[in-house]
Amino acid sequence: MSQEYTEDKEVTLTKLSSGRRLLEALLILIVLFAVWLMAALLSFNPSDPSWSQTAWHEPIHNLGGMPGAWLADTLFFIFGVMAYTIPVIIVGGCWFAWRHQSSDEYIDYFAVSLRIIGVLALILTSCGLAAINADDIWYFASGGVIGSLLSTTLQPLLHSSGGTIALLCVWAAGLTLFTGWSWVTIAEKLGGWILNILTFASNRTRRDDTWVDEDEYEDDEEYEDENHGKQHESRRARILRGALARRKRLAEKFINPMGRQTDAALFSGKRMDDEEEITYTARGVAADPDDVLFSGNRATQPEYDEYDPLLNGAPITEPVAVAAAATTATQSWAAPVEPVTQTPPVASVDVPPTQPTVAWQPVPGPQTGEPVIAPAPEGYPHQSQYAQPAVQYNEPLQQPVQPQQPYYAPAAEQPVQQPYYAPAAEQPVQQPYYAPAPEQPVAGNAWQAEEQQSTFAPQSTYQTEQTYQQPAAQEPLYQQPQPVEQQPVVEPEPVVEETKPTRPPLYYFEEVEEKRAREREQLAAWYQPIPEPVKEPEPIKSSLKAPSVAAVPPVEAAAAVSPLASGVKKATLATGAAATVAAPVFSLANSGGPRPQVKEGIGPQLPRPKRIRVPTRRELASYGIKLPSQRAAEEKAREAQRNQYDSGDQYNDDEIDAMQQDELARQFAQTQQQRYGEQYQHDVPVNTEDADAAAEAELARQFAQTQQQRYSGEQPAGANPFSLDDFEFSPMKALLDDGPHEPLFTPIVEPVQQPQQPVAPQQQYQQPQQPVAPQPQYQQPQQPVAPQPQYQQPQYQQPQQPVAPQQQYQQPQQPVTQQPQYQQPQQPVVPQPQDTLLHPLLMRNGDSRPLHKPTTPLPSLDLLTPPPSEVEPVDTFALEQMARLVEARLADFRIKADVVNYSPGPVITRFELNLAPGVKAARISNLSRDLARSLSTVAVRVVEVIPGKPYVGLELPNKKRQTVYLREVLDNAKFRDNPSPLTVVLGKDIAGEPVVADLAKMPHLLVAGTTGSGKSVGVNAMILSMLYKAQPEDVRFIMIDPKMLELSVYEGIPHLLTEVVTDMKDAANALRWCVNEMERRYKLMSALGVRNLAGYNEKIAEADRMMRPIPDPYWKPGDSMDAQHPVLKKEPYIVVLVDEFADLMMTVGKKVEELIARLAQKARAAGIHLVLATQRPSVDVITGLIKANIPTRIAFTVSSKIDSRTILDQAGAESLLGMGDMLYSGPNSTLPVRVHGAFVRDQEVHAVVQDWKARGRPQYVDGITSDSESEGGVGGFDGAEELDPLFDQAVQFVTEKRKASISGVQRQFRIGYNRAARIIEQMEAQGIVSEQGHNGNREVLAPPPFD
């Protein structure tokens, strides 16, 4: 058979047939094509040439080249994101074809058809699900064309959620049709995987990792004495390990080399001298009789089996483990006393001299420095030396303990009945961790069952002691707090024989446990709270959580443990009796509640071990726990401060009153907390100064909850009553000394509620005066009961004492900052955190509030309102009906036209009409109002010429108008890719495409519309778009707001050159400064030889790169106070925004018209741009001079065609719908474009303004709004240089004729009306003529020239 197997392993090369050669070659090519396709899909770039884009000006980015770009674009267009799965599907198909290439089975065409149907269903539903739920990829729909068709079809019928569910159902059916898998099988497979993962995770968490390196724990100076003792014990442990190794080698002689007797070795409990079986596994390690995995009996099994390996053959390692457990327990709870390991008596059995089967028996009497070995008599005593330290420490408990000791004495003696002959004692130390705690749910019946088992003991020595078992007294034993009334039973005196000094084996793990036990005991001593006024403890309530096994000192556990144990169950009974002796105060009624951490189904029901790790001082300090010395110093400091507070010498009357109010508030909060529990504090505001303390407390609370749930929090308080199992002891439980870890972490669990206190800083100096809350916890250690401090464990779970943990946690934070905290009551006296008397709501956009500086260079789009994710689909059926209705209404007016196309938009829908031959478009324009009436719409706008089409447009409003959000317009490639810092967004056109304009190319903008038409919203959208595009060093603003409402919200942003101008006199000066700045920039640009500001800035940047800045060519030493020659710097664009241009014209008059005209004519090259907005589109405001220099205009809704012609030079604005609906006449274009303006809320404007305020303060330029040379700042002329050249001749004419009129000057000098009016105004300013009277006449004040 092996020869045949060897021949099969030889690999031979076989020739393929021609068909298979061709097939495999074809499959290889297809796989390579799939890899290439995946690379093309992953490297897709929208700028590459493709089906949707044929022109490009950059190199191809796609890894597949031009074919890859075309193919990727096509697949994305058709399938969307599902295109990424196509290469995977191709590779899977190739693999399937290769695997089934040799099968010549009959082809089931019905099955093939079902698979094809399943594939189609999977493709369609996957694309539909992607279209409904996934975001779009690049500029493609997420589900491609297929998904878009499905989503648009299903959403009107089933909505998005219903469509998703329907598509999921079809997808599931398609998967079954394609693969043939049943969903029941899929669910079972998934469940099996999940259970395997959970089983693996649970088995990993049950691993015993309690042994760690000694370096993990910090060694303190106070442990030097213990370290010397531990070294001495380690030497003995090494000697014993050598003996155990020899026994291991001897045991290996009985092991089958092939390992065929592994199962028998694992599950056997026989002695080593039994020839047929051994107690070792294949690895030579002794089998653990208490292991829940390898034990074959349950702890609650009532009958006795004389061939039971657990009860009939106890291994020799059991007394060693018992002694080790007792040693660890004793040292962990009696650290001040020298740790001693007692020796139980040796069983009287003949054994070979090379295998000393010595049982370790504790000798009664005072503790000695060295342990002794005593042979075990036939009835050895139950009182052991391990109980002596606890009894001496708790002297008041000796009387009530004695009557209870003989009560469970038979259970303690039962393990002695069987001598054992285990050949080796190599049990691992972690064996005792599996403590059989939960096998006795009922107090009386459980113990009776154990007594019945003990009657089957083969020895009669212990049968006479069954009279001491009183099941009837078991129930009141744990209910009555005075067990002294029971009659004690006299025990036989222990026989002390000659012993020789020796010690039980101490393994390395036991040494670690000893050190950790000493650390736990020392930490428990550290955290004894400072004594306070004594108060009687509250009575114990039955609803409290039962203390853990380690709550009672495990020193007593070894007293009742027999070295010749016949089973785990009887040893557990004995340790339960010792637990009753050690802790009578906590003996409460038993209960049958379920116990945690029990593995059922195999062996006795034993609890899982609990991992314990004692935190170091450094970790405790990180948790906020401090040492007793520090707490004592804090207590002294609090006492001194309390005395100082009581004296009241350093506080005035106001401070004392504030402290009294704080104390009343604290008492009220405490009362409310006691009434409503801990949840009351969650609603109280936290003081900002305690933010760090609150964070520490929260971290400590979370860590404590984790530790509590992991180690001792499996059973909530009050969930299960007390049971006898809570006080059971065993050798396993002795080493599992997890009792002190809960009191150690109690300071961590308790400060949970501290940050939520209403007056945390003020409460701290009042803590010494409130000893009532801490008394139930601090009084417990003062009682003369040894296990009393452990009884504090369930107290942190009581809801009626939430104040004590908070005060306890605040103490570590007081020593350093305690003195400043006494000044905290002065803070509530301050009415506002702001240093101002103004109300916070009166702050202009929160100008003085502290702001956090953002990290992004420009504001985030998250500040703006996002558009809704679900957009209502277009009702094509309704549009078809409207098209037929339009044709019918036109036919009513004898106009034959056909609707050839329609373009739905967010606000209006354009119907394209193909007029019959000979029909003029003017006829439809004249019928616009009649068509609106007949079609029952608000307004109808007729577009006579559509660029590029021979049709006439008819624009009708939609029934449901959609809002155009600024965020969706800004988040667009047209806006992002525009490099100009003056890019502004207007909204969307009738097709829903964003409209983006460049203010630098306009170069000025005139905005007009009636009140409420959306003019101010449009201006805000332009400003915000520039704030999202440019930095302050690129664009600066001069804002003129006569109404003091629209642009004043931008006060304080760093883009402003000066404060928002609200006085029209200052507005004229600002415009004049712009004219002077324009002239200065022209001089600088001419000196550098550039044509515009962009070229000027490029020259400056080039000089900076050369490290040779350009000096100012027009600077003179007397021009400024600079010591050095100033250099030229980068000049920003300046945008002058006037919100109400008509008010400026009316207030200042025609004087600013010249300034605006000059800026409109020349300021474009200098980088100064005007945005003029007005709600009065009349000819006296928008004059011909202004219109001639501002070609770019925006018209919102106006009242008449005349106003529309004033703005746009054509009609159409009167037919707009309002609320942002506008006509935009761009540069170099005479045809206006209908745009639906982006909507901007006030909250969005405030958010963006606050974001820019947080980035920096504005750097204002002095002298923009002030003009010292003009008279009152409104003259508009700078002395004689501004006078008209004909001024002197006109003055001579007026003084000679003695008549001053604008028409007379105009006729005399043949000039225009505006120039003649300015000359007369100049005469008025010079005092030559008087002001205009009520009849329009003026008087000549100057004398005649010849007088």
Swiss-Prot record:
Residue ranges that the Swiss-Prot or TrEMBL entry lists as coiled coil: none
Annotated signal peptide: none
InterPro entries: FtsK/SpoIIIE/SftA, FtsK_4TM, FtsK_alpha, FtsK_dom, Ftsk_gamma, P-loop_NTPase, WH-like_DNA-bd_sf, WH_DNA-bd_sf
Sorted UniProt keywords: ATP-binding, Cell cycle, Cell division, Cell inner membrane, Cell membrane, Chromosome partition, DNA-binding, Membrane, Nucleotide-binding, Transmembrane, Transmembrane helix
Regions of compositional bias (Low complexity) in chain numbering: 434-443, 462-493, 670-679, 754-834, 854-864
A cellular-component GO term for this protein: plasma membrane
Membrane topology: Multi-pass membrane protein
Composition bias type Polar residues, residue spans: 450-461, 703-712
Periplasmic membrane side: 45-74, 133-162
Basic and acidic residues: compositionally biased ranges: 632-641
Subcellular location(s) of the protein: Cell inner membrane
PANTHER family, per the entry: DNA TRANSLOCASE FTSK, SPORULATION PROTEIN RELATED
Function field: Essential cell division protein that coordinates cell division and chromosome segregation. The N-terminus is involved in assembly of the cell-division machinery. The C-terminus functions as a DNA motor that moves dsDNA in an ATP-dependent manner towards the dif recombination site, which is located within the replication terminus region. Translocation stops specifically at Xer-dif sites, where FtsK interacts with the Xer recombinase, allowing activation of chromosome unlinking by recombination. FtsK orienting polar sequences (KOPS) guide the direction of DNA translocation.
Domain remark in the UniProt entry: Consists of an N-terminal domain, which is sufficient for the localization to the septal ring and is required for cell division, followed by a linker domain, and a C-terminal domain, which forms the translocation motor involved in chromosome segregation. The C-terminal domain can be further subdivided into alpha, beta and gamma subdomains. The alpha and beta subdomains multimerise to produce a hexameric ring, contain the nucleotide binding motif and form the DNA pump.
Quaternary state and interactors: Homohexamer. Forms a ring that surrounds DNA.
Entry similarity comment: Belongs to the FtsK/SpoIIIE/SftA family.
Stated name of the protein: DNA translocase FtsK
Gene symbol of the encoding locus: ftsK
